[in-house]
Amino acid sequence: IKTPSTEDALSWLSEFTEEEAKMSLSLTDNCPILAKEYLRTNTIQTREDFINDISGIIKSGKDIVTISKKWIEDLDTLPMKVEWMVKILYDTIKFHADDSLQKLTEDTDNISRYLSQNTHIEKVHNLLAQTYATWTQFSSDSNLNKEYQLNSLFIDWEKLLGISKKV
């Protein structure tokens, strides 16, 4: 099945603001059914909160324990947030490989670009593997302690990205 044009998708999402519709289409790779679900379930606000949290961790070493507890309180969105972390790292690798790229994921490009310029790429690759492994555990609904796993992941981000040295 062919993905509809952006105009058709925006028309289908006309009950929402154009800005919201474009953002949700961007987050869902132009999949209007999923975009509508994102808009109905307030996933856009979850995304904004995620960006604030993750950029705080990356740029200023924001309290990872507090953020971890906050994320654990909403287990339904946890796999999605970790998937978004994976996407940031993918984009970081792409920006590092080709600095002429203008745009990948509009709302997190600044984070990915920052990481591509301030972190050794080997560390990003290692962190990507660890983040993806954590996402797999959360997505498969394993019986491992999710709070422990998330804290461990945030500590890996801190260590491998050198955040604590910047604070």
Language-model-derived ranges and their functions:
Residues 1-84, 88-167:
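Charged, glycine-rich active-site and insertion segments that engage polyanionic ligands
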